[in-house]
């Protein structure tokens, strides 16, 4: 499972998850992607389950890119423990995902296969998602030039 090799601080505050993703919100590596429609925490186990669902469906046909990494430790106090006595021990790792974040990408497969793989993957996610395809945007200032005959 994914987790950082080293961290500067063992325990972190919970933080806020509101707002849209400004980074990681475009398809960068593959042709198709799974995009988050809401904010949430995605655990390392959920990321691994999603990766397995995608790779099992596409077999050896394509390539998968995981665009999120669980770098936030979540602490938990033991069961039946009285409150106080400090913050609990780190229990699991999560990736903080905001609205619009690209989480997984696929390349080298047909659009139908990619859509089905992402549909299966979306069942493993705790947030609402959508299937997106790579668009080749026209750079500002450029216009599409038709070939002269």
Curated annotation (Swiss-Prot):
Coiled coil: none annotated. One of its GO terms (molecular function) is structural constituent of ribosome. The keyword Hydrolase does not apply. Signal peptide: none annotated. GO terms for cellular component: cytosolic large ribosomal subunit. GO terms for biological process: translation. It comes from the Bacteria. Pfam families: Ribosomal_L16. InterPro entries: Ribosomal_uL16, Ribosomal_uL16_bact-type, Ribosomal_uL16_CS, Ribosomal_uL16_dom, Ribosomal_uL16_sf. NCBIfam families: rplP_bact. Part of the 50S ribosomal subunit. Belongs to the universal ribosomal protein uL16 family. Binds 23S rRNA and is also seen to make contacts with the A and possibly P site tRNAs. HAMAP family: Ribosomal_uL16. This is Large ribosomal subunit protein uL16. It comes from Dehalococcoides mccartyi (strain ATCC BAA-2100 / JCM 16839 / KCTC 5957 / BAV1). The gene is rplP.
């Amino acid at each position: 499972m994914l987790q950082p090799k080293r961290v500067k601080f063992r325990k972190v505050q919970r933080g806020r998850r509101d707002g849209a993703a400004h980074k990681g919100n475009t398809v960068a590596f593959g042709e198709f992607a799974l995009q988050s429609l809401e904010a949430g925490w995605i655990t390392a186990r959920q990321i691994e389950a999603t990766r397995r669902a995608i790779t099992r469906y596409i077999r050896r046909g394509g390539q998968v890119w995981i665009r999120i990494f669980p770098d936030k430790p979540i602490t938990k106090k033991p069961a039946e423990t009285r409150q106080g006595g400090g913050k609990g021990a780190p229990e699991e790792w999560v990736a903080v995902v905001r609205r619009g974040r690209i989480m997984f990408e696929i390349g080298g497969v047909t659009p139908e296969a990619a859509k089905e793989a992402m549909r299966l993957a979306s069942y493993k996610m705790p947030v609402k998602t959508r299937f997106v395809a790579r668009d080749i945007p026209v750079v500002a200032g450029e216009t599409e030039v038709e070939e002269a005959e």
